Regions:
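A compositional/structural signature for long, glycine/proline-rich flexible linkers
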Residues: 1-167
Length: 167
């Protein structure tokens, strides 16, 4: 983000007709609120169950079930790795990627229990194809820890002791 320039956009609505909505009725409001409740419950259950399943491979980074990822809307052009992580204050989690296939882009990031990215605005919680330090042999080593160990590709936990991760 240090080298990126903010986008400059102009949005203009063209071909607009008078499409003002009808007044909100009690019935429409009720349906909307019921739908919101169903969405929140469904999302919370989905991510809770998914994160629970990652506990079997804590502090590892195995390939995810690609068919499952695609069945819930994952991009078939992406090969997913998911797991959970947990670190004490004095621990580090080292991920070695000896060979990364040629691709347009890749990204590794730390997430919270609900699979939301950690605070990327104030912390370095991800590394990608364009920001990574590559070793001479083309491999990449990512180091996750609470404190900066002074190595390339350090990912900080942003004050969290546990969460999920995705490559």
């Amino acid at each position: 983000r240090v080298n990126e320039k903010p986008a400059e956009l102009k949005i203009e609505r063209i071909g607009a007709s008078d499409d003002r909505p009808a007044p909100l009725t009690a019935e429409k409001l009720l349906r909307g609120l019921q739908g919101a409740v169903m969405f929140v419950r469904g999302s919370a259950t989905l991510f809770e169950n998914w994160s629970e399943s990652f506990l079997a491979t804590i502090n590892e980074l195995p390939p995810a079930d690609q068919a499952y990822c695609q069945s819930i809307g994952g991009d078939p052009n992406i090969f997913y790795f998911h797991s959970a992580w947990q670190l004490a204050d004095d621990e580090v989690f080292v991920i070695d990627a000896p060979e990364i296939p040629e691709c347009q882009t890749w990204n590794f990031q730390l997430d919270n229990w609900w699979m939301e990215s950690l605070d990327y605005r104030h912390h370095t919680i991800h590394v990608n194809k364009h920001t990574a330090h590559y070793n001479d042999d083309g491999s990449v080593r990512v180091v996750v820890s609470h404190a900066d160990p002074g190595v390339p590709n350090w990912i900080e936990t942003a004050g969290h002791n546990m969460g999920t991760l995705c490559w």
